[in-house]
Amino acid sequence: MIPSPTVTEALCITGGPRSGKTGALVERAAAWAEAIPAGPVAQPPFLFFCASPVTIDDTTSRLSQRGLADAPAEAAGPAKSAACQHGPRTSLCTGLVTTPFDYACRILADPLAQRATGRGGRVLSQAEEAVFYEDLKTCGLKRRRLRELWAFLQCGLVNLSDSDPDWIQTTEEQAVLDLARSILIFEEAVLPGEAVNLAVRALEAEPALRQRFGSPVVLADDYLLMSRASQRLVNLLATGKIAVAGSEKTALPAFEPYPCATGFAEFETAHAPLQRVTLEAPFRSLERAWEAAPDLAGEMALIARTIAEELAGGTSPDAIAVVGTNRTWRANLQRALTSVDIPAAPMRHPAFKAPKGDLAPASDNEREHVLRQLRDSITRPDDSHGSRACTRAGINDAATRNNPPASPCAGDSIAWRQWLSFDDALGRSAAVSELRRIAQPQGLNLAEALAALDADALPGLPATSPFTQSLLTPYREAQRLLAKRSGNDQPTIVTSPAAAANRARESSSSSKADTALSLANLTETRENDAAATPTSPAPAVAIAAPEDLFGHTFEVVIFGGFVNGFIPSRDMCDPGVIVGGARVRQEATDRDTIALAEQRATRRLLFTSFESCDLETAERLRLHIPRIRLRNGVRTCDIEPSNYLQELNLGIRQTSGPTDQSHPSA
């Protein structure tokens, strides 16, 4: 690890879950911030990094009580400036609370960072990343192999392995990586998983960026839940003092999919001598129990009855969480609770999730959203300020020759690619691949290439080509819709053959104006998740996957579906399917899942299971089936409680009564 050469004090706080690590960081932030001399500042007095967006509000609330941060609603977001705007410091000046990912996007918005990395554009949303993955399938690899290979490459980027000359060892790996970079450059895009990597490379290449975005005090919570790239970013930004905190016990990934478990060791090596503080978690009296129901319907009735008793005793619905590892089980439980007038809502946890499977059919709302993006990114003829222009950074000469600045009239390349994916994702991926092969050597991005193609000014792709027709049909449909909806404020797309032919030669004059990185959709994934989750003023019981519990605490946590097939999974129940190191890692993950549920409960933790299920349901839920019986003409499977149950030392099991046949899930 390459630390900042100006760091004068380093602190590492370790301890178990809920041992007061965040509180200790807040106290240290207060002490260090008070010691900063007053005067004009261009940097925030401190940066506080959280491993997940979930914990930002809580951390900001704690800091605001000390006068060190704005209200939680004003917590640092990716679209705001990273500089402290409070002028001369006469008292404690508020710092910034953010995540490494959001702050990396701030850094990439700087023209100096863009020149250092040679990359412009904006960060892809989750839906846009899925389209990118569709384009990646044109490499010709089988889906499973491509998925494995892409996971390896993504892991390498967040672990900064791209600086190792021995990282890529096969032609196959190099081909996929080159294709991915070609697609991203053609569409002027940045993958969420590479944003922190690019920011680190920019900081290492340009010391001026450290001075501009660094801070005299940097703090990082849940340090071991960050990737190596995020940890490196935190260290590079510290210009005076740095403190990190985290638990050395293994834990489920919170936000970033590839956390670096060796972060403390690397931190100690980089900042020796190091001050260490170890905190002990106080004893917590937690009521732990396990109850079993005769069947699946009985378990849901048991959970509903338990929640009803808690609500009758005065427990707030939002202080109760029901955890299950199976998505279908959680959906059925939510319907069952709602039908008996128990408010319940799914909990969603923001995370970098790799696209899987085929693209889902686009809804009307998605089409409207993309059309708005296109409308806002296309410059009107009378728009003298270019407020709707898609801008990109000026970069070094070699990169400029290959990637000339985008035309302000062609539109957002990412939005155009999203629009082309509607209705025929597979065919359009092949067509865009052919368009990229011809247009990219001419210095055109996707939006410019489509404009040239529409004007029949793109040599190499004749109008009679089926690829041309596949692209121009939706392209012209979008133009028609934009013209219809804009009316007098109609945006136009320059399709002049002369303009398309000259775009590759406009780098010199245009690059001076093209200095901003468009991050309009940076938080689109998170906003879409919030929009998909129905918000109600009334509190509701949380229905969650185990990883969703991170950053939250509940009085009562019910771990339902605690059976073989759910945890451990069906494949884990067969000793011959998952073996060796993979089995050891999965067992560790399962135990971390159970531990997280226990850590998030403050008063009561209840495990529930069921003893039987019909064969059809068992197969649909992928339950482990040790034995099948015929009961009343129905093939019924015996379902065993989780193999991890004996490790919990819960004593004699409590079996609930017979199923209430009037219950909606029965």
Task: Go through each PLM region and give its residues.
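Structural recognition of the conserved hydrophobic beta-strand(s) that form the central parallel beta-sheet
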Residues: 48, 97, 241-247, 607
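Accessory N-terminal region flanking or inserted into the helicase ATPase core
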Residues: 1-19, 23-24, 45, 114, ...
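Conserved helicase C-terminal RecA-like lobe
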Residues: 217, 221, 376-638, 643-647
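Helicase P-loop NTPase motor core
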Residues: 4-42, 271-347, 359-364, 368-400, ...
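Catalytic acidic motif of RecA-like/P-loop NTPases
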Residues: 54, 223-227, 249-250, 547-548, ...
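Catalytic P-loop NTPase motifs of RecA-like helicase/translocase cores
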Residues: 104, 220-234, 251-253, 551
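Conserved P-loop NTPase-based nucleic-acid remodeling module centered on helicase motor cores
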Residues: 14, 41-152, 175-178, 266, ...
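Conserved RecA-like helicase ATPase core segment
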Residues: 231-301
